[in-house]
């Protein structure tokens, strides 16, 4: 029996109209849908996707326990269990679609599972979604870059990388816990 494919599908930043046609097609064509969390309706990625693909609620739904913790052992254990759960379906020839916020290639939970699944011999594919920072710029009606400007996408927790004195546009990802410092650094840089 041919093994299934694990798809990491970005569902965009929150507006179901921003889901890509490919994301919608991949979700529609496959019967097993995975997402981080236990209850579908409490998971942001599921809530976005089900608005664009209402038939999603009738599919096989896999809520995967992927806690938001900094404990490396707990993370490794949860990711291993989630990958094994997905692999069980792949081994039966079923494709599995893992829903992730934004774009599947930018700070996505799926990329950790992707590595584990590939190590198990499974095929994976990433399906792009609209990144939150692109949607925010469009919502504000401002370009991220013009002409030869530089665009820097930086994790806000990496203080060494956040040098706001360099020219260009900065996108500081994962800034929630670091917002006070980001504001202070921005003010110090005259922004």
Predicted regions and their residues:
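Generic beta-sheet signal
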Residues: 35-36, 64, 127, 147, ...
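Thr-Gly-centered strand-to-loop micro-motif
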Residues: 35, 100, 154, 173-174
């Amino acid at each position: 029996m041919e093994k299934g494919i694990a798809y990491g599908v970005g569902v965009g930043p929150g507006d179901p109209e921003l889901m890509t046609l490919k994301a919608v097609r991949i979700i529609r064509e496959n019967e097993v849908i995975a997402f981080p969390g236990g209850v579908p309706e409490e998971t942001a990625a599921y809530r976005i996707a089900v608005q664009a693909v209402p038939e999603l609620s009738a599919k096989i739904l896999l809520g995967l326990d992927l806690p938001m913790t900094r404990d490396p052992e707990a993370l490794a254990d949860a990711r291993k269990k989630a990958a094994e759960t997905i692999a069980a379906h792949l081994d039966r020839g079923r494709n599995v679609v893992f829903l992730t916020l934004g774009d599947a290639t930018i700070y996505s939970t799926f990329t950790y599972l992707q590595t584990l699944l590939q190590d198990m011999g499974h095929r994976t594919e990433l399906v792009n979604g609209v990144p939150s920072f692109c949607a925010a710029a469009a919502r504000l009606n401002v370009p991220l870059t013009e002409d030869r400007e530089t665009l820097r996408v930086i994790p806000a927790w990496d203080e060494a990388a956040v040098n706001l004195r360099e020219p260009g546009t900065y996108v500081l990802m994962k800034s929630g816990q670091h917002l006070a410092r980001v504001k202070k650094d921005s003010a110090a840089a005259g922004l």
